[in-house]
Amino acid sequence: MMREWVLLMSVLLCGLAGPTHLFQPSLVLDMAKVLLDNYCFPENLLGMQEAIQQAIKSHEILSISDPQTLASVLTAGVQSSLNDPRLVISYEPSTPEPPPQVPALTSLSEEELLAWLQRGLRHEVLEGNVGYLRVDSVPGQEVLSMMGEFLVAHVWGNLMGTSALVLDLRHCTGGQVSGIPYIISYLHPGNTILHVDTIYNRPSNTTTEIWTLPQVLGERYGADKDVVVLTSSQTRGVAEDIAHILKQMRRAIVVGERTGGGALDLRKLRIGESDFFFTVPVSRSLGPLGGGSQTWEGSGVLPCVGTPAEQALEKALAILTLRSALPGVVHCLQEVLKDYYTLVDRVPTLLQHLASMDFSTVVSEEDLVTKLNAGLQAASEDPRLLVRAIGPTETPSWPAPDAAAEDSPGVAPELPEDEAIRQALVDSVFQVSVLPGNVGYLRFDSFADASVLGVLAPYVLRQVWEPLQDTEHLIMDLRHNPGGPSSAVPLLLSYFQGPEAGPVHLFTTYDRRTNITQEHFSHMELPGPRYSTQRGVYLLTSHRTATAAEEFAFLMQSLGWATLVGEITAGNLLHTRTVPLLDTPEGSLALTVPVLTFIDNHGEAWLGGGVVPDAIVLAEEALDKAQEVLEFHQSLGALVEGTGHLLEAHYARPEVVGQTSALLRAKLAQGAYRTAVDLESLASQLTADLQEVSGDHRLLVFHSPGELVVEEAPPPPPAVPSPEELTYLIEALFKTEVLPGQLGYLRFDAMAELETVKAVGPQLVRLVWQQLVDTAALVIDLRYNPGSYSTAIPLLCSYFFEAEPRQHLYSVFDRATSKVTEVWTLPQVAGQRYGSHKDLYILMSHTSGSAAEAFAHTMQDLQRATVIGEPTAGGALSVGIYQVGSSPLYASMPTQMAMSATTGKAWDLAGVEPDITVPMSEALSIAQDIVALRAKVPTVLQTAGKLVADNYASAELGAKMATKLSGLQSRYSRVTSEVALAEILGADLQMLSGDPHLKAAHIPENAKDRIPGIVPMQIPSPEVFEELIKFSFHTNVLEDNIGYLRFDMFGDGELLTQVSRLLVEHIWKKIMHTDAMIIDMRFNIGGPTSSIPILCSYFFDEGPPVLLDKIYSRPDDSVSELWTHAQVVGERYGSKKSMVILTSSVTAGTAEEFTYIMKRLGRALVIGEVTSGGCQPPQTYHVDDTNLYLTIPTARSVGASDGSSWEGVGVTPHVVVPAEEALARAKEMLQHNQLRVKRSPGLQDHL
């Protein structure tokens, strides 16, 4: 920005420094001051002052002696720099003062105002009840306030009854900003007010928000009525803002030309004392409509519909005519769908979708067609349901509303009785010949009605059908057949039925017009013999094949009775009807609606569209291609059967061989493979079928025109490379590295054959293994290893186990021998073993295959390694590739099956599931994290043991746990995360202590605000606490003046002391004067014990304190005593009134301590269930630099003389009943037995 200003000011200054010295540099400063003080985009002027100083110092001279030329140069410079064409500098030497602004209208008399309004406003009601209002200048608030009643009565009132409104702003070049809300408000619903714009004024440096008015004189224009705003290139200023707002509100359609891009307020200001004047926009629109980023100032308002200004009104009226017809179009569309659309289940969704569609943007028939089609397609997903525009030159032919189906049979044409003429007719329709190879050829170019075929049947049989009966295959040519009535389709299909005994279901139709569903079956009685599909039928199609010919082709393909060759058919079915929706002088709209549902024998509805052939070729090439396919099909049976035989002989999973072979034979018999037109498509279909029935993705059939080395020919002996070659290969194939922490890293991307490994073993040990064997742990990276030979796996595994005893790795079932072979580690290996105790990590990815999977699964299965990465696909230890007969078709299948040494189950099909599943790119870093974690385990166990020994409530048991914990380190050898470490540590601590309250947890960094005992809870304000108290305590006075108090958690004693007066005021006063008390602890989960003395004190008399309990604290090895308080806030309940405590199995912690104290001291009767057996409030301790935390019970009750306690065993009630019955039993006992029933001395005092 600074550079731009320097250039601009240099031009300005130089322009003022001509040889006549008429213009001083101060003019530049005056010009800048005008901009700074008045330009409504002050943010664009940053850096201008500095630029002026630099320009003044530049001393460049530009000789411009003519002031008009100078004004033009200055204007160009300013407009270019600020990118604002509204900035204009003019030279006006005869103007003593700035040109006067438009005189204030408020100074005019009422008659003058009326005359001004009549010149600036025109209104009338046009044809079609369309209101027209032309505004040439927008009056301000003062004028509208003065003349509002007149305008409403004589202008607006005449337009209120119109059906739509045209607001003509084509000649409006200005007006007052204060008039904007009035015009907008009359077009906006009155139930809400809307913020439509914010105006910034630079001279006053203020912003003014413009809102619609909550109330207006007269009525508002109906929100459901259309409004069109007309614009031209002359429309400027306030009128542009009105057009922009109404467009952004989607309240009006803007028609005409892009507006002038003016300003809300343009002022012409004198530059200093000179004769130059500066025209500057001083106000601008800030939005909010349009998000503040879209502005019309400088660029203009773009119309919704662009048209020359002089044609805008005519265009607007055409748009309104169309839009007035929209309700009728939608209603007509809905009625047609209800009456005719064949997919009845989709009609409610369509109707609902149409009812909710927004047509506010529709301004043309094209928009309407696009909108309707998008909605219909979205709701129905039926490409046949289509609205289209019919031009004025087209002549639509609408069927009668009750017309029968287009494909319904009409009156059969009368046929001549003369036999010779009938024979000639048949000869003209059908072309029959026998091609070389005894292949029949039948062409017919139209479909006749079934009744016509019935009459001509004897001639057709004799002249057409009988010559084809002895052919081995049949080619039917439908390339030139546009179809016809569908009534003959079932009859023709019946001639191709197989040897089935009964009728075959061909297809089903549902006709919406008649509401009839009809199933179509093959005819059992036919004139003449059938042509069994066992001989092979081939249909030729083209883009001209249509209607009934398409149906016939579709069904022959769907039934598996024919192979289709040629082009995709026309997709022109006779299952629809066309219904008019709208007629206008410019054309019409019509809906094509499907009236017939066509369902094939698989239950799939045919939604139109052309029939796709099995072999797609040009129509003129179809006959030659059909003969090629026919020749290929001669070998189809042998190829399919041969594939089945190979599976039976070699596939490693004999339990599924029978199923796969049976499937192949069944599909072959059904003609399912006739859709295969070459070896590629047959291979693809066979692969899909084999994988589907077996669930084995490794079964593949493929076409390879070249020769392959197949079956199990033994490979040639591996060639041993020279030492130089070997060194190069090892460095290229193996990557080794010792990572921080003595972590070895080994990557290799292929599994070599065992003999090769043995041959180069010494070099491998020297160049690779010796660098890694002494590391503390090892990562083996198989993420890029696709596998290959599995024979070296036992040798590789042996390095990670001891020599003795030998380890059973896995078993292999070999299909060729039908034997199971166990694979074991080797007793001897070259070099040093890595051993069985150091950690091993294997990295995998989805591309890791076969032998790499076998190694990883074996080491994982034997718990010797941690597998990290992605699940593998499941390869095979051995794959055989077998040629199908002598063809170029090959079958690839697993010939061996790997079985787990621990479970005996096959795993190779499922692949390897990692212990830790992460993206392959993260696997190595995760392995390093686990190594670091496992290195911490001894220290973590030591720290955990010390924390337990120093803090557990039982010092003796804590010391024993610490000692035993260090001996369990082997249980943590395969830990993979802090979460798992916490689970094992917590289980061990609870096993050693028998205490379920001694816990270990993993708490992530982002959850540490919820760790009890680590981060103190925030104490709310007194106001919030008062509401919390009301919510947390439940009180009631039951029948017979029995008090009821329930709270579900104990608070901190210090906190309760601070809010004791609130508790007394809002809780205690409600129940303190009752005759007996029920305290409900059934849902209380505990809390701090410091509040127990406060609560207990209210239920004992004033006088000597009562010892409630003694609490032993292990961290400071001390015993503290709990006593009642001598002073309490409010009144005591005393010790004479009856008191019952309700308990459940949920009652825990401090609630149990309170219950235990009141029971032991004989102050309360306990009714309910045995409590949970919790502990004193535990403490939480952080373990080293991990995210592990131990929750340790650090205190226990020691107040009972007999050493008994509730901790771990719970408090047993006096009266044991289910928790849900406890309250009823307590009320019953207090009401009926308190004064009458004599209890044992231990209970008498509190009844």
Swiss-Prot record:
Subcellular location: Secreted, Extracellular space, Extracellular matrix, Interphotoreceptor matrix
UniProt-reported outcome of changing D1080N: In RP66; abolishes secretion; results in mis-folded insoluble complexes degraded via the ER-associated protein catabolic process
Main location: secreted
Record: glycosylation sites: N205, N515
GO BP terms, alphabetized: lipid metabolic process; proteolysis; retinoid metabolic process; visual perception
MF terms in GO: retinal binding; retinoid binding; retinol binding; serine-type peptidase activity
InterPro entries the record matches: ClpP/crotonase-like_dom_sf, Tail-specific_protease
Pfam families associated with the record: Peptidase_S41, Peptidase_S41_N
Disulfide topology: none
Biological function: IRBP shuttles 11-cis and all trans retinoids between the retinol isomerase in the pigment epithelium and the visual pigments in the photoreceptor cells of the retina.
Similarity field: Belongs to the peptidase S41A family.
Designated name of the protein: Retinol-binding protein 3
